[in-house]
A protein has these predicted regions:
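Short alpha-beta junction capping motif
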Residues: 38-42, 86-130, 228
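Bacterial N-terminal signal peptides that target proteins for export
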Residues: 1-10
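Extracellular ligand-binding/catalytic regions of CAZymes and related secreted enzymes
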Residues: 26-36, 62, 66-69, 204-218, ...
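Glycine- and acidic-residue-enriched helix-capping/strand-helix junction motifs
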Residues: 45-57
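Catalytic beta-strand/loop cores that center a nucleophilic Ser/Cys/Thr
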Residues: 142, 147-227
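Bacterial N-terminal signal peptides
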Residues: 10-21
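Solvent-exposed loop/turn segments at secondary-structure junctions
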Residues: 44-47, 77-80, 96-100, 120, ...
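A short, well-structured beta->alpha microelement
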Residues: 67-80
Length: 282
């Protein structure tokens, strides 16, 4: 009996000392975002500019330190050239709004990056970006139309098994803006939805009008594979305080990690567009 106990203790000691560290290293090495380089783009055109942008950037930089990836932050559209974009595994547009490119050559470089297999994470008012560029609006999944006033309401987790929903509540009650859009693209897969019945009633007429054919649930977070690339969008994150909230930080982190998991490599042989307005691939 004593020998048996010694054997079990030795086996346990072996697992803790030798096997556990190896397993931990394997987990770290296979974290897809580790050692990646991201472009965080913050440009806004004429119009409303969110005061959350610096806080969003700081939050992503802190996540980069914690999870071993790097970020380049820019509000200069000159970064959108083929040679420059090749440096990045995916792009993050955080609360961009209105026209964020200066030239159609920059728009074409962005489009070809997506076609080559690049990834895109869009945060909050990204749905109000490049409102006159049809291809971009399809890539995003919608274009902004209106939001209810800032208030506490509920967002429902529609796909809790999706990798980017890890640690996200089944029903998330938070203060934010409930975004609505138009020109919704049918390729998006909804991950979270605004629970419209949880909104304050004084704007109910405008809410019903903007919800269109949707009833009580309206898309808030979604993803899609689009034209060879990969897209993850959250309309949440209006307040600057959001970016220091642990639940929201995790929400953003899981979106970044999901996009990292989709990256293979850029292959510009698949980038066929010669104009920003070329038809979609057949």
């Amino acid at each position: 009996m004593r020998n048996s106990l010694k054997s079990h203790l030795f086996a346990l000691f072996f697992l803790i000392v030798f096997v556990a560290p190896v397993s931990a290293k394997i987990i770290l090495k296979t974290d897809p975002i580790k050692n990646m380089q991201l472009l965080v783009y913050t440009k806004n055109g004429k119009g409303y500019v969110h005061d959350n942008i610096a806080f969003a950037v700081s939050s992503i930089q802190n996540l980069a330190k914690a999870y071993g990836f790097s970020v380049v932050v820019s509000n200069n559209p000159a970064v959108f050239t083929e040679s420059s974009l090749k440096k990045f595994q995916f792009l993050v547009f955080t609360s961009t709004n209105n026209n964020v490119f200066d030239t159609d050559d920059q728009r074409l470089a962005f489009r070809r990056y997506i076609e080559a297999g690049g990834g895109f994470v869009g945060v909050h008012s990204v749905t109000g970006t490049e409102r006159n560029w049809k291809w971009f609006k399809m890539m995003i999944g919608e274009t902004f139309s209106w939001h209810a006033k800032f208030q506490k309401f509920t967002i429902k987790n529609m796909d809790p098994k999706h990798p980017s929903m890890q640690g996200v509540p089944a029903k998330w009650e938070r203060e934010d803006e409930c975004y609505f859009g138009k020109e919704l693209y049918p390729g998006i897969k909804v991950l979270m939805a605004h629970e419209l019945s949880s909104l304050q009633p004084e704007q109910s007429e405008t809410i019903v009008k903007n919800a269109g054919s949707y009833a009580n649930y309206y898309p808030a977070v979604w993803y899609q594979d689009f034209e060879g690339g990969h897209v993850w969008i959250t309309t949440l994150g209006h307040s600057k305080e959001s970016y220091s909230e642990p639940v929201y930080q995790n929400h953003l982190l899981q979106g970044l990690k999901y996009m990292a998991s989709k990256y293979k490599r850029l292959n510009y042989d698949n980038a066929k567009s010669t104009s920003k307005d070329d038809p979609l691939k057949p």
